[in-house]
Amino acid sequence: LGVSEDADYDEYEEEDDDEDLPQDESDSPPDVPGTLALGYLACAPLLAAYEWSLATSAEPTRSTAEVCLFRFLLPLGEDAHLARQGILLALLIVCLLRLARHSRGLGLRLMKVLGEGALWALLLAPTLMLCTHLLGGVEPPAGFSVEPGAAPGLARAAFILGAAAHEELFFRVILYSGLYLTARVLMVHFGAGLTCARLVGEAVGLVGSAGVFAALHLAAFTTWLGSGGEEFEPFVFLWRLLAGIALGGLLRWRGPGVAAWTHALFNLGLLLGAGPEMGF
């Protein structure tokens, strides 16, 4: 997958026994399936929180990313949610089996993913504000920042956490990878060198997935999914575009688990009134 090729995820990889290691470890390729498996396992609590929020809410709201991910289940009607849960559970089992032979220290690696996500969540808001200030030309709308208010309901907080995980799976893992691979294959087909093709693929995947991420928060682009979405506001759109680029970079560098927990904890902070009013 394009999201993890050439990335250094060795910090989250468990060393094999000596006889399983290649003679030259520096030449060994990154363990893409292992990285994705660890990332999905780290996302499991977030996805479970999302399912719980849907089950306990009187009028459940669904994430746009989740609707897009599982739109192919619509013909199943009322059984679609059971099929979705079955797919998520099956993926979890596959990931557990993939990581079984490297299970020693797995809990520590998962805690490192969560801790790193919390750290990046703290750094993300000031980084986005600095970038929007440096770019200039747009001003935050009135009421963009709020003071901490009453604590949200538990179901709402669970939804916010789980929706972030679905957005990382859809916009970063799937869409980023798809755009990257498509652009890379096309560049090679038209005679570009492999290095050039990779760079173009990275740019197309990173910016393209971030642009779609920002656009699918707007009513103009979500009418085909049903009600919901916001009116276009330049600052908020730029904010989300930059957020998508930052999260895509995190995914590429640190893996999907870190990106998902960064996104989830950042949005939870916004919900609690810790920063800008508009979540992304």
Language-model-detected regions and their locations in the chain:
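Membrane-interfacial, low-structure loops and terminal tails that flank and connect transmembrane helices
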Residues: D8-P33, L108, M187-L199
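Transmembrane helix-loop-helix hairpins at the membrane interface
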Residues: L154-F280
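Alpha-helical transmembrane segments and their helix-start/interface "positive-inside/aromatic belt" motifs
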Residues: D27-C43, G105-L119, G257-A260
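Interfacial helix-start motif at the membrane-water boundary
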Residues: F70-A90
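Alpha-helical transmembrane segments of multi-pass membrane proteins
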Residues: A42-S63, L128-H133
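Alpha-helical transmembrane segments
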Residues: L36-Y50, L119-A121, L206-V212
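Juxtamembrane helix-loop-helix connectors linking adjacent transmembrane helices
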Residues: L69, L73, R101-H166, Y180-C196
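Central hydrophobic cores of alpha-helical transmembrane segments in multi-pass inner-membrane proteins
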Residues: L88-R101
